[in-house]
Curated annotation (Swiss-Prot):
Keywords from the UniProt entry: Acyltransferase, Cytoplasm, Fatty acid biosynthesis, Fatty acid metabolism, Lipid biosynthesis, Lipid metabolism, Multifunctional enzyme, Transferase
Region (ACP-binding): 257-261
Enzyme class: transferase
GO molecular function: 3-oxoacyl-[acyl-carrier-protein] synthase activity; beta-ketoacyl-acyl-carrier-protein synthase III activity
The protein's role, per its UniProt record: Catalyzes the condensation reaction of fatty acid synthesis by the addition to an acyl acceptor of two carbons from malonyl-ACP. Catalyzes the first condensation reaction which initiates fatty acid synthesis and may therefore play a role in governing the total rate of fatty acid production. Possesses both acetoacetyl-ACP synthase and acetyl transacylase activities. Its substrate specificity determines the biosynthesis of branched-chain and/or straight-chain of fatty acids.
EC number(s) stated in the UniProt entry for this protein: 2.3.1.180
Assembly mode: Homodimer.
Any one annotated GO CC term: cytoplasm
Gene name as annotated: fabH
InterPro entries linked to this entry: ACP_syn_III_C (IPR013747), ACP_syn_III_N (IPR013751), FabH (IPR004655), Thiolase-like (IPR016039)
The organism of origin for this protein: Porphyromonas gingivalis (strain ATCC BAA-308 / W83)
Comment text on domains: The last Arg residue of the ACP-binding site is essential for the weak association between ACP/AcpP and FabH.
Name of the protein: Beta-ketoacyl-[acyl-carrier-protein] synthase III
Pfam families, per database record: ACP_syn_III, ACP_syn_III_C
């Protein structure tokens, strides 16, 4: 039996129409455009303002975009893995809601949560379902309504986050394309540096936790920045060395869009020219697990079969990693 690979054969995304600019934030907190651009490189971010719509709404729209533009029948999907840090509810899973709404039938579906790298974790998990030989098509969606947990009285964190969703379809192939390798890591030493302090079983919601604003993202920015630069750079070097890749072999670097200075550091460490790096943080901010698939969607028309992509991310926990992908189709042919 020939080796089975898991190829990315389609991408989709959805971004809400409403925008929060740096000028808007200047009216809410003590900040300004120059301060935000200098520190993180974000000009604006998208927001899903409807309080009755959660991450599932964004995921549904992203999946529909993929189905419509690529001519995919939802009934052909064997399973759905949903990456999110902003699920609609603790239970049921957001994945089950999405699978039903997009018309996939009674397929298996589940949520994954590994902070901002959840998409690359889910990509490797989905690829292994394909490699098992039991499944032909796995839909991997990353969806985030991060603004629901953003404190718009905190000048340190409110400029960072935006809402959005992106997705990819993994399909079985015997060609030498697809998810070729992944390095995934975690270390709980970072727990207290990037956290939502309340709402889980360790600290259930009370009047006190609400009054203390513990249901919003808390971040110690300098600590997180230092670890992110080191760990994202190291994971990229690790996957390049494991696969004998030089910087000349890489067509595109797809970094998590958390901070422009982190992205710059990763590109320098890999020795890759900046024109090979996908960057859209200025327009969308940090959409957590969704940043990488949103990049793939935005750059799809430039991607060619055989292109070598290295994706890398870092997040709470700490969690981090990198994935090596050989692109499976010419994006210029897609609507």
């Amino acid at each position: 039996m020939n080796k089975i690979n898991a190829a990315i054969t389609a991408v989709g995304a959805y971004l809400p129409e409403d925008v929060i600019t740096n000028d808007d934030l200047e009216k809410m907190v003590d900040t300004n455009d120059e301060w935000i651009m200098t520190r993180v490189g974000i000009k604006e971010r998208r927001i899903l303002r409807d309080k009755n719509k959660g991450a599932s709404y964004l995921a549904i729209r992203a999946a529909q975009d993929l189905f419509e533009r690529h001519g995919i029948d939802p009934k052909s999907i064997d399973g759905l893995i949903l990456a999110t840090n902003s699920s609609d509810y603790h239970f049921p899973s957001t994945a089950s809601i999405v699978a039903h709404e997009i018309g996939c039938g009674d397929i298996f579906s589940f949520d994954m949560q590994a902070a901002c790298p959840t998409f690359i974790y889910a990509l490797e998990v989905g690829a292994n379902f394909i490699r098992s030989g039991r499944y032909s098509k796995i839909l991997v969606i990353a969806t985030e309504k991060m603004t629901a947990f953003t404190d718009y009285t905190d000048r340190a964190t409110c400029p960072l986050f935006g809402d959005g969703a992106g997705c990819v379809l993994l399909e079985a192939t015997e060609e030498e394309v697809g998810v070729m390798d992944a390095v995934l890591h975690s270390n709980g030493i970072g727990k207290d540096h990037l956290i939502m302090k309340a709402g889980g079983s360790a600290c259930p919601a009370t009047h006190e936790t609400v009054d203390n604003r513990w249901h919003y993202v808390y971040q110690e920015g300098q600590v997180v920045f230092k670890h992110a630069v080191v760990d994202m750079c190291n994971s990229c070097v690790e996957i390049m060395e494991r696969n004998n890749l030089s910087h000349d072999d890489i067509t595109w670097v797809v970094p998590h869009q958390a901070n422009l200075r982190i992205i710059d550091a990763v590109a320098r460490r890999m020795g890759v020219p900046y024109e090979k790096v996908m960057v859209n943080i200025e327009r969308y901010g940090n959409t957590s697990s969704a940043t990488i698939p949103i990049c793939l969607w935005e750059w799809e028309h430039k991607l060619k079969k055989g292109d070598v992509l290295v994706m890398t991310s870092f997040g709470a926990g700490f969690t981090w990693g990198a994935v090596y992908v050989k692109w499976a189709y010419d994006g210029s042919t897609v609507r």
